Design a protein with these regions (language model features):
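Active-site loop signature of alpha/beta-hydrolase-fold enzymes
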Residues: 122, 152, 168-170
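Short SAM/SAH-binding signature in class I
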Residues: 158-164
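Mobile active-site "lid"/loop adjacent to the S-adenosyl-L-methionine
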Residues: 167-189
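Conserved SAM-binding strand-loop segment of SAM-dependent methyltransferases
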Residues: 138-149
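Short conserved loop adjoining the S-adenosyl-L-methionine
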Residues: 149-156
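Class I S-adenosyl-L-methionine
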Residues: 1-110, 115-134
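Conserved acidic residues
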Residues: 86, 159, 205
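Conserved Class I SAM-dependent methyltransferase catalytic core
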Residues: 97, 121, 186-210
Length: 210
């Protein structure tokens, strides 16, 4: 506890200076930085650095969730105390994700299958590197899936879908929009969040998206 309390919390300006100094907008440099951790930052600081280094945020419509929002959201998820095995889906995992808190939430369930999806290959690879610095419970099996969730074909249903799906509209990509509408009830929208909610509702009884 003392070690955590003594950790310096970096401001956004300080993090941006680190991003510029190490040229972390380049995903290759960011991966090396996370792996080597030359400044010996704690895991939360590494997550923050990774988020602010993500130059693809606008391209993939990905926006990351504040820690306090994630904490409050996970605390209200069903406990599944009567279950020995559950399946969880995170359909747009990004970099700052729910995984560490899900580890704590479901540490007493014997078997947890956790499928994490992201359309951005670099975000998935960076997420993996960050998780390597986190103690993953033995009861968790994590499957990383580099796919577009909206057209991805699931093999089974889930007990829980949780995450922070992308916001924004599909513009100037008619073929992509047509493929989303083809598998959706709402044919009038081009909003990604709407498509995500509709598909998530087909996959699980419990849905928690923000």
């Amino acid at each position: 506890i003392k070690k955590v309390l003594n950790q310096k919390i970096l401001s956004i300006n300080e993090i941006n200076k680190i991003v510029d100094e190490y040229n972390l907008q380049d995903s290759s440099n960011l991966k090396i930085f996370i792996k080597d951790n030359p400044c010996k930052y704690d895991i939360n600081t590494l997550y923050n650095i990774a988020e602010l280094s993500n130059i693809n945020r606008n391209e993939t419509k990905a926006y990351f969730t504040r820690e306090d929002i994630v904490f409050n959201m996970v605390s209200k998820l069903p406990a599944f105390d009567d279950r020995k095995s559950i399946k969880i889906l995170e359909p747009s995992v990004g970099i700052r994700n729910f995984l560490p808190l899900l580890f704590k939430k479901y540490k007493n369930i014997s078997n947890v299958i956790l499928d994490v999806i992201d359309i951005d290959k670099n975000s998935l690879e960076i997420s993996k590197l960050l998780l390597e610095k986190t103690k993953i419970p033995k009861n968790f099996i994590i499957n990383f899936i580099n796919e577009d969730f909206l057209i991805w074909e699931n093999e089974y249903l889930y007990d829980l879908v949780v995450g922070n799906p992308p916001y924004g509209k599909v513009i100037n990509e008619k073929n992509l929009l047509d493929s989303y509408k083809a598998i959706s009830q709402n044919k009038e929208t081009n909003n990604l969040f709407s498509f995500f909610i509709e598909k998530a509702m087909k996959l699980a009884k419990y849905i928690s998206l923000i």
